[in-house]
């Protein structure tokens, strides 16, 4: 199988110049495709080019999903003209294991995205904090104890990471909220711009569900932060 992308374009009069490549969750064993499409449609409704990425699952080959995401980001930058996108305004986003993938690009990729939005992301491989299934799929069950630490995002963050917006729910029983807090703490220790929202409830996997109590808060906080990032990109471009 190969990776695929679907592109949702905003109405030209609404376009912000930003694009976001979205990585659906699924514990690296499957993909919540529907939530990915819904999220990308919502981005487009708000002036952002939404790019839904159906990435290949790792099956123990840890480089596979990240290669797909890196290629998708590069493709969007190459197509910037026809998409009405500024190539310096291409971000990534994802939920759960997809949040881990987006975070991996923002922290580890050589050619990083310009920003990342991580929604209840898997971050840490520490035994008391991790979502075990994600790391088993990433490095192979037999390699988790020896290999997973080098893929623990909070352990590999440095000052080259891109700005981050992170969401989690305090009562998440699948991926503990401490994952989000650990990454935020390490981003700040490295001088990286980051914003963290931990909602009181909601559990895991709320995505774009209107049943999520903080759905409107989540949407507003995301758009507010993207506006800030957009203004900063414009300011940086004006200085050049």
Give each language-model segment a name.
Residues 181-240:
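C-terminal catalytic histidine-bearing segment of alpha/beta-hydrolase fold enzymes
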């Amino acid at each position: 199988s190969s990776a695929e992308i679907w592109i949702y374009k905003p109405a030209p009069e609404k376009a912000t110049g930003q694009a976001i490549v979205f990585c659906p969750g699924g514990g690296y064993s499957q993909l919540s495709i529907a939530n990915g499409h819904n999220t990308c449609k919502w981005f487009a409704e708000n002036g952002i080019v939404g790019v839904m990425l159906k990435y290949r699952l790792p099956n123990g080959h840890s480089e596979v999903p990240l290669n797909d995401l890196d290629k998708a980001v590069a493709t969007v930058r190459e197509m910037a003209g026809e998409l009405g996108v500024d190539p310096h305004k291409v971000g990534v986003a994802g939920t759960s294991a997809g949040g881990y993938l987006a975070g991996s690009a923002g922290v580890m990729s050589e050619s990083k995205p310009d920003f990342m939005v991580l929604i209840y992301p898997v971050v840490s491989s520490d035994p008391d904090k991790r979502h075990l299934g994600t790391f088993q799929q990433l490095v192979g069950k037999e390699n988790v104890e020896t290999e997973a630490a080098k893929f623990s995002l909070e352990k590999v963050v440095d000052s080259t990471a891109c700005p981050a917006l992170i969401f989690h729910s305090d009562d998440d029983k699948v991926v503990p909220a401490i994952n989000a807090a650990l990454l935020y703490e390490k981003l700040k220790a490295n001088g990286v711009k980051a914003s963290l929202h931990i909602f009181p409830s909601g559990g895991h996997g709320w995505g774009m569900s209107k049943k999520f109590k903080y759905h409107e808060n989540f949407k507003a906080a995301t758009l507010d932060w993207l506006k800030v990032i957009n203004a900063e990109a414009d300011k940086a471009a004006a200085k050049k």
